[in-house]
Amino acid sequence: MPAVTQPRGESKYDAIPGPLGPQSASLEGKVALVTGAGRGIGREMAMELGRRGCKVIVNYANSTESAEEVVAAIKKNGSDAACVKANVGVVEDIVRMFEEAVKIFGKLDIVCSNSGVVSFGHVKDVTPEEFDRVFTINTRGQFFVAREAYKHLEIGGRLILMGSITGQAKAVPKHAVYSGSKGAIETFARCMAIDMADKKITVNVVAPGGIKTDMYHAVCREYIPNGENLSNEEVDEYAASAWSPLHRVGLPIDIARVVCFLASNDGGWVTGKVIGIDGGACM
C-alpha cells in the first residue's frame, strides 16, 4: 500500500499528528499495562492490545494461572507480554507494579485501569465494611493507578479508566454503592484530563453496560424482575430484547475495540470523555 502523505500546512497548528490511513490505528511498538487482566473485560483488553501490536503487562491480584494463560496467548499471537501481581487496593502495590512494568519493557504508553468489584444491596443494609471494599478498588484504586500512570507514561500517553453506565443510568435499585464508586471516575477523568495535559496524556472513561463475562448472568439477574427464576439462556434473551435495540448482548471484545481506538492515534483528540458502550441501553 503506498504511503499516505500529509498535506503541507501554513502553521504548526496545521500539522497532522501521526500517520494517515490505516496506520493511524496501529499500536505497533507501544507498551500497555492492563489492571485486572486475568479474566473478563481486562483479559480481552490485554488480548486485543496484543493483537494490534502492543507489548502488554498483564496485572492480576489472585488469578495467577489465568494471567499466565493470557500472557501465553499474547505471545502465541506474535507480541510479547508479562505478568505482574499487584492488588490495586494497596497503594504500595500500585507503585511497585508500575516500577516493575517499566523495568520489563522499558516504557509505558498506555494504561488501562480495569480492576473492579461489584456490589448490590439496599442502602439500609450497606455496612461500612462493604462500602470500603467497593470504594477501595473501584474508586481509590483507580485514582492511585492514575497517579502512577501520570508519573510513568510517555509523553502523549493514554490513560483509560473503567466506569459503568450505572454511573449515569436512572433508577437502578440496590446499587447505590457501586454506582457511586463508578460515578466518581467520570469526574476524575474530566479533572485529570486537565492535569495530565502537560504531558499530552489523554484521559478517558469507558462505561460498559452489561457485558457477558463470568459474572454476567448473576449480575443481570439483579436487574431483571424475578430474574432468579430464569435460566442463563433466558437471561440472554431478556437482555438482548429488552436492553438493546440491536438485539444482542455485549461482549468483552466490544469494550476492547473502543479501548484500542482510544489508545491509538485515532483517539488522540478525545480526552476527558465518558464513552458509553452499551448497545443503546442508556440513551
Swiss-Prot record:
Q: Where does NADP(+) bind?
A: 39-63
- GO BP terms, alphabetized: melanin biosynthetic process
**Into which EC class is this enzyme placed?**
oxidoreductase
Residues binding substrate:
S164
InterPro entries given in the database record: NAD(P)-bd_dom_sf, Sc_DH/Rdtase_CS, SDR_fam
Signal peptide (UniProt feature, chain positions): none
- Keywords, comma-separated and alphabetical: Melanin biosynthesis, NADP, Oxidoreductase
Top-level lineage group: Eukaryota
Q: Name one Pfam family in it.
A: adh_short_C2
Q: Name the chemical reaction catalysed here.
A: scytalone + NADP(+) = naphthalene-1,3,6,8-tetrol + NADPH + H(+)
Region Disordered, residue ranges: 1-21
Catalytic residue positions? Y178
GO terms for molecular function, please?
A: tetrahydroxynaphthalene reductase activity
Q: What is its EC number?
A: 1.1.1.252
Please name the pathway: Pigment biosynthesis; melanin biosynthesis
Q: What does this protein do?
A: Catalyzes the NADPH-dependent reduction of 1,3,6,8-tetrahydroxynaphthalene (T4HN) into (+)-scytalone and 1,3,8-trihydroxynaphthalene into (-)-vermelone. This enzyme is the biochemical target of several commercially important fungicides which are used to prevent blast disease in rice plants.
Please state which protein family the record places this protein in: Belongs to the short-chain dehydrogenases/reductases (SDR) family.
Subunit: Homotetramer.
Database matches in PANTHER family = OXIDOREDUCTASE, SHORT-CHAIN DEHYDROGENASE/REDUCTASE FAMILY (AFU_ORTHOLOGUE AFUA_5G02870), SHORT-CHAIN DEHYDROGENASE_REDUCTASE FAMILY PROTEIN
What's the protein here called?
Answer: Tetrahydroxynaphthalene reductase
Taxonomic path: Eukaryota, Fungi, Dikarya, Ascomycota, Pezizomycotina
